[in-house]
């Protein structure tokens, strides 16, 4: 089974990333925290048998910043669409359109996620059409699919 994983992220620019933390941290500290999150999740992704993609915002941002953090061996492409749902859908549609059997899309500010969590999600996709990684607050940190589903 050909597996792909998309890291869905912003380019860590001071004042533009992790802005909800700015009452507590400086813009530079927020960008540094984001960089640390990117490195942590990238380390876990390397342990999984999947091709890794990075889907970034803003689309006119300097992708070299991300390449310096995550490495040049990944494919990078910009997020497209108006809403978060549209951007996620277009990302999954693009990567699955490259011939992958399954694809996981995940955020990057989840330091607790480990490679076994990702492997488990890929295992679920052997039996199911979709998988979600739930968060304690009722949201999700990961979505995986065999084919892009617009809903």
Region annotations inferred by a language model:
Residues 1-20:
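N-terminal nucleotide-binding beta1-loop-alpha1 segment
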Residues 13-19, 63-65, 141:
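Short acidic/His/Gly/Ser-rich catalytic and metal-binding motifs that mark active-site loops
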Residues 32-50:
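A short, N-terminal amphipathic alpha-helix
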Residues 50, 100, 127-130:
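Short, high-confidence coil segments that cap the C-terminus of an alpha-helix
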Residues 50-59:
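Short beta-strand/loop segment that forms part of the nucleotide-sugar
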Residues 66-102:
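Short phosphate-binding loop-to-helix
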Residues 104-106:
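Short aromatic-hydrophobic micro-motifs that form the base-stacking/packing surface
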Residues 111-140:
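Conserved donor-nucleotide/metal-binding helix-loop-beta segment in metal-dependent transferases, i.e.
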């Amino acid at each position: 089974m050909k597996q792909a994983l998309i890291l869905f992220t912003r380019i860590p620019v001071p004042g533009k990333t992790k802005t909800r933390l700015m009452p507590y941290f400086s813009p530079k500290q927020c960008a540094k925290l984001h960089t640390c999150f990117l490195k942590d999740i990238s380390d876990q992704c390397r342990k999984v048998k999947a091709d890794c993609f990075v889907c970034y915002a803003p689309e006119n941002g300097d992708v070299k910043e991300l390449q310096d953090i995550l490495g040049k061996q990944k494919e990078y492409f910009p997020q497209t669409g108006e809403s978060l749902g549209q951007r996620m859908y277009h990302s999954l549609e693009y990567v699955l359109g490259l011939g992958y059997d399954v694809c996981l899309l995940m955020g990057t500010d989840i330091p607790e996620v480990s490679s076994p969590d990702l492997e488990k999600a890929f295992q679920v996709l052997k039996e199911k059409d979709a998988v979600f990684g739930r968060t304690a607050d009722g949201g999700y940190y990961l979505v995986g699919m065999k084919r892009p589903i617009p809903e």
